[in-house]
Amino acid sequence: MEKLIESLSDAPIIDKDGYEYLVHPISNGVPMLDPDLLREVVVEVMQTADLDVDKIVAPEAMGIHLATALSLQTDIPLVVIRKRPYGLEGEVSLHQQTGYSESEMYINDVEEGDRVLIVDDMLSTGGTLAAICTALDDIGAEIVDIVVVLRKVGDSALDDTKFDATSLLDITVEDGDVTVH
C-alpha cells in the first residue's frame, strides 16, 4: 500500500460548497493514474475481497477502472451501474445522493440469486453505496462483499443499512490535509 499512501500526500483538496473534496488518481483519474498504483490497489483488493461471486458490480464512473482490472485478473464478469438508462428489460433505477451531487443510476444484468462483489473507489458520504446496496438487495442479489479503496472516517449513509464495506485505507480530509488512519 506504499504507492497508495504516497499518492495521498500529493493529492489536491478542493472546496465544493463547503465539502472538502479529495482529487485523487484512483477516485478521479486526475492527476494521471500510474499503472503501478492501479496494480497495487487491485492486488490488495484481490487479497481483501471475498471473490467467491458470480459478478463484480461497480458504479460509473470511477469504479469502472478498478472493477475492469479486477475482472481481468479474476475472470469474474463485470457489471457497471450506469448513470443513464438504456431501457433494457429488467433495468432497475435507483436514486443516489452524495455530499455534493444527486442523480439516478441504472442496474442491468443483475438478477435474483446472483452473488455479487461491489467495488468502488471511495466511501465518503455513503449515498451511492447505500442506494446501490438497497437496490441490489431489492433485486434479490446476494451482496457477498463490498470493498472500497478509500473510506473517509465518519458517519455515512451506509451506516443506516445492513451492509458493511471493507476499505483498503481509512482517511480523514481536514483543513486541506489527508490523514491515513
Curated annotation (Swiss-Prot):
Enzyme class per UniProt: transferase
* A single GO molecular function term of this UniProt record: transferase activity
Q: Which GO terms describe its biological process?
A: purine ribonucleoside salvage
Gene3D superfamilies hit by this protein: 3.40.50.2020
EC number(s) recorded for this UniProt protein? 2.4.2.-
Q: Where is the signal peptide?
A: none
Sorted alphabetically, the keyword list is: Purine salvage, Transferase
Tell whether Transferase is among the UniProt keywords.
yes
Q: Which SUPFAM superfamilies match?
A: PRTase-like
Asked if the Swiss-Prot or TrEMBL record annotates the protein with the keyword Transferase, the reply is yes
- NCBIfam families with a match to the protein in the record: HPT_Archaea, PRK02304.1-4
Q: What does this protein do?
A: May catalyze a purine salvage reaction, the substrate is unknown.
Q: Which family does it belong to?
A: Belongs to the purine/pyrimidine phosphoribosyltransferase family. Archaeal HPRT subfamily.
The protein's name in its UniProt record: HGPRTase-like protein 2
Source organism per entry reads Haloterrigena turkmenica (strain ATCC 51198 / DSM 5511 / JCM 9101 / NCIMB 13204 / VKM B-1734 / 4k)
